[in-house]
């Protein structure tokens, strides 16, 4: 869709189009469309601005990533659809590994996400080789399946766009 730059919600609509494209390309689960809509509604309610609290959290996360010995960036379908190049740039800047980790588990979708991240410049993407899988005992969701060299061994994990079970 060609969204006019003059539209008052140009940025939001452009992001929405990336999510839809990600769904059509097999990166985003249909439930990911709903999750994005929920986040978009919340963003609208807070005035589509980054709060001071969020800015402080971003800075704290950056410090944690930079001081970690084994940082990992966890990527789901929505993240892969919205900002694969930025994930790769952040991983390079922080010496972090990248791992695909999904709630709506699908090996085919994992491979598509891996391909998208590699196209964006990632040299290595963890979380797609069943021989490297381990389970985190305290989680009941499919997100408990992680890579032995990634999230399983990490001292810091950045989980963008998270709404629950892994970040408590």
Label for each model-derived stretch:
Residues 1-21, 87, 116-125, 129-130, ...:
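Charge-biased, low-complexity intrinsically disordered regions
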Residues 93-144:
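Long, charge-dense
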Residues 131-152, 156-167:
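Active-site glycine-rich loop that binds ribose-phosphate moieties when present
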Residues 74-77, 101-102, 158-162:
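Short His-Asn-centered micro-motif
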Residues 1-97, 107-109:
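Electropositive, gly/pro-rich neighborhoods at or near active sites that engage anionic ligands
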Residues 85, 167-168:
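A short secondary-structure junction signal
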């Amino acid at each position: 869709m060609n969204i006019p730059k003059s539209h008052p919600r140009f940025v939001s609509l452009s992001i929405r189009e990336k999510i839809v494209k990600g769904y059509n390309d097999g990166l985003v689960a249909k439930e990911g469309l709903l999750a994005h809509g929920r986040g978009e509604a919340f963003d609208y309610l807070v005035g589509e601005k980054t709060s001071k609290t969020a800015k402080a959290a971003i800075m704290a996360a950056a410090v944690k990533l930079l001081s970690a010995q084994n940082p990992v960036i966890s990527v789901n379908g929505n993240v892969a659809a919205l900002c694969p190049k930025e994930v790769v740039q952040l991983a390079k800047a922080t010496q972090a590994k990248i791992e695909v980790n999904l709630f709506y588990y699908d090996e085919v979708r994992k491979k598509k996400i891996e391909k998208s991240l590699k196209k964006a410049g990632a040299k290595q993407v963890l979380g797609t080789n069943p021989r490297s899988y381990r389970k985190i005992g305290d989680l009941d969701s499919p997100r408990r399946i992680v890579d032995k060299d990634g999230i399983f061994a990490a001292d810091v994990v950045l989980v963008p766009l998270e709404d629950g079970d892994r970040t408590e």
